[in-house]
Regions:
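Short glycine-rich His-centered loop
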Residues: 1-13
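Alpha-to-beta junction loops
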Residues: 27-29, 45-54, 97, 133-145, ...
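Short beta-strand-to-loop elements that line the ligand-binding cleft
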Residues: 29-36, 101, 116-124, 130
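Short loop->beta-strand "edge-of-pocket" segments that line small-molecule binding or catalytic clefts
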Residues: 1, 91-104
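Short, hydrophobic alpha-helical packing/hinge segments within bilobed ligand-binding/sensory domains
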Residues: 18-19, 40-43, 107, 127-130, ...
Length: 173
């Protein structure tokens, strides 16, 4: 898990710990500002913060505007459906289906490019909740994040229906 709250409500995770170590080495003080996914780049543009450390993926459009760290991870996208949904076996099967997505994520673009009807939500939890509640047919998201969710919610009633062959890099912006 890259960013999450521990049992005491403290922000932690791989991204948090790496940024804290880098800041410590440079003698900087770190203040984390939690922001909805779709507002992260706007916050960077407005100089509300100096870096995005939340499993960000450089897209060609983003690389034109932002500097990124070297990738520290590569992850595939997955389509998550209800466990009893067998209608989605490939990315093209998303055509005409509702998919819960964060508006600005790379995975949202993949869902849209495959003909999904995008229902915009703010977070992975909302994506998966919308699938679980039957408000949407699927969500396309990062495999590692989904596997972490399944580890914490083994009886979620959801499944990974499809895994992408494409792996995208993750870094800090």
């Amino acid at each position: 898990p890259f960013t999450f709250h521990d049992k005491d409500g403290k922000l932690t995770g791989f991204d948090v710990e790496i940024i804290e170590k880098v800041a410590q080495k440079l003698g900087w003080k770190v203040e984390f500002k939690e922001t909805a996914w779709d507002g992260m780049y706007a916050g960077l543009n407005a100089k509300r913060f100096d870096v995005i450390a939340n499993q960000t993926n450089p897209s060609p459009e983003r690389l034109k505007k932002y500097d990124y760290s070297a990738p520290y991870n590569y992850s595939a996208g997955v389509i998550v459906t209800k466990a009893d949904n067998d209608s989605i076996k490939s990315f093209p099967d998303l055509k005409g289906k509702k998919s819960a997505q964060s508006a600005t994520s790379n995975w949202s673009k993949d869902a849209r490019d495959n003909g999904a009807i995008i229902v915009t939500v703010d977070s992975l939890a909302q994506n998966l909740g919308a699938v679980k509640q039957g408000r949407v047919d699927a969500t396309v998201n990062d495999k590692l994040a989904v596997l972490d969710y399944f580890k914490k919610q083994p009886n979620s009633g959801l499944k990974i229906a499809v895994e992408s062959d494409k792996k995208i890099p993750t870094g800090f912006a």
